[in-house]
Curated annotation (Swiss-Prot):
It is found in: Cytoplasm. Keywords: Amino-acid biosynthesis, Aromatic amino acid biosynthesis, Cytoplasm, Transferase. It catalyses: 3-phosphoshikimate + phosphoenolpyruvate = 5-O-(1-carboxyvinyl)-3-phosphoshikimate + phosphate. It comes from Cupriavidus pinatubonensis (strain JMP 134 / LMG 1197). The lineage of its organism: Bacteria, Pseudomonadati, Pseudomonadota, Betaproteobacteria, Burkholderiales. This is 3-phosphoshikimate 1-carboxyvinyltransferase. One of its GO terms (cellular component) is cytoplasm. PANTHER family: AROM/DEHYDROQUINATE SYNTHASE (PTHR21090), PENTAFUNCTIONAL AROM POLYPEPTIDE (PTHR21090:SF5).
Length: 434
């Protein structure tokens, strides 16, 4: 197996220009495809997940071209030209979920599949929501999971659509992004969220981007959303993709652990991504944080003992970046408790289980529950001979690069899995650490 040995590292300092946000990139691509006219997308993330979306759109007859680092998408006006297709979605949840909803309203015959892990990631709550409006979606293997078969259907909306919010916010995002294409007798479509909505900041991203494409959704708390029916998606002409706030977390944590200053550029106070609030968590742990509209900078703690300190944090607002805190906890005095992280279990891998397993290999004491993780740093650091497993999960690989600030080298297995969102991560990380 391919692996990469890092550290031990003692210092982190420098500036990182972040790659584009995955969450924003795939949302923008689909909205541009549904809009009329051309949309120039600047700073799009170049990664496995965005390539999956671009290839799917091309298969569906949506034209796009690349000009330098820009992508120009020629929208379909809400009607994909190709009405029968088989689409391979890799392990891209941000692609398969909204596309499933969009295709259910297209009146075509489509099959969607992915890698084996994708076929273990739930999609049943979204399918249930779409079936409420008459969509014809069948499971080709296990009930509630891809692969899927979508057939032509008569879509009718005469009652509120109910969707669960406690498994993944991507189900609600998919409905919000695509239901404006549908017709409703009174011109409005109501979506009711059942249970507590997790990962609310990702819904904020969705609503913000919909508004950029001319779709204004009325939000009543986090329980009810009113979507305009039969709406026209209007291209903004040009749209910039912010830097990825989840990817920023590794460098900001490195600044906190390795002294800093480490500055990330591409996200800041004006960001629409919830994960920028990761910097607040580092500040609570004792790190020094500064920020502007488009940058964040972190230095180490000024405490007498030079250490960060453990915190207890409800992570609903930073679900992806919270993983980075679990590894940063190795360098904090006391125990760090991360709660409200149930969504980790249905991501690229079961991230609660995977994180607990790999932290223990380094000597940490870890308690895991259905939706929480408690991490106490190692009394004695260990170097696992078999390395750190990454579970084909880009965020596991990037998180555990921070373990190289410990007193022993750390071996990261399958480092290439970072291609999902940040192909040159380890080169960039190496540029600001020593």
């Amino acid at each position: 197996m391919e692996h990469l040995t890092l550290g031990p590292l003692t210092r982190a300092a420098g500036t990182v220009r972040l790659p584009g946000s995955k969450s924003i990139s795939n949302r923008v691509l689909l909205l541009a495809a549904l809009a009329g006219g051309e949309t120039r997308v600047r700073d799009l993330l170049d990664s496995d997940d965005t390539r999956v979306m671009l290839q799917a759109l091309k298969t569906l007859g949506v034209a796009w071209r690349q000009e330098g680092s820009d992508y120009i998408v020629t929208g379909s006006g809400g009607n994909f030209p190709v009405k029968a297709a088989e689409l391979f979605m890799g392990n891209a949840g941000t692609a398969i979920r909204p596309l499933t909803a969009a295709l259910a309203l297209q009146g075509g015959d489509y099959k969607l599949s992915g890698v084996p892990r994708m076929h273990e990631r739930p999609i049943g709550d979204l399918v249930d929501g779409l079936r409420q409006v008459g969509a014809d979606i069948g499971y080709l293997a296990n009930e509630g999971f891809p692969p899927l078969h979508i057939r032509p259907a008569q879509i009718r909306i005469d009652a509120p659509i109910r969707v669960r919010g406690d498994v993944s916010s991507q189900f609600l995002t998919a409905l919000l992004m695509t239901l404006p294409m549908a017709q409703a007798a009174n011109g409005k479509i109501e979506i009711e969220v059942v249970g507590e909505l997790i990962s609310k900041p990702y819904i904020e991203i969705t609503l913000n981007l919909l508004a950029r494409f001319g779709i204004n959704v009325e939000r009543q708390g986090w329980e009810r959303f009113i979507v305009p029916a039969g709406a026209v998606y209007r291209s903004p002409g040009e749209i910039y993709v912010e830097g990825d706030a989840s990817s920023a977390s590794y460098f900001l944590a490195a600044g906190a652990i390795g002294g800093g200053p480490v500055r990330v550029e591409g996200v800041g106070m004006s960001s629409i991504q919830g994960d920028v609030r990761f910097a607040e968590a580092l500040n609570r742990m004792g790190a020094n944080v500064m920020a502007g509209d488009n940058w964040i900078e972190v230095r180490g703690t000024e405490r007498d003992d030079g250490r960060l300190h453990g915190i207890e944090l409800d992570c609903n607002h930073i679900p992806d970046a919270a993983m980075t805190l679990a590894v940063a906890a190795l360098f904090a005095g006391g125990t760090t408790t991360l709660t409200n992280i149930a969504s980790w279990r249905v991501k690229e891998t079961d991230r609660i289980s995977a994180m607990a397993t790999e932290l223990r290999k380094l000597g940490a004491t870890v308690e895991e529950g259905a939706d929480y993780l408690k991490v106490t740093p190692p009394a004695q650091w260990q170097t696992p001979a078999d390395g750190i497993g990454t579970y084909d999960d880009h965020r596991m690989a990037m998180c555990f690069s921070l373990a190289a600030f410990g007193p022993l080298p750390v071996r990261i297995n399958d480092p290439g899995c970072v291609a999902k969102t940040f192909p040159d991560y380890f080169a960039v990380f190496g540029g600001v650490t020593r």
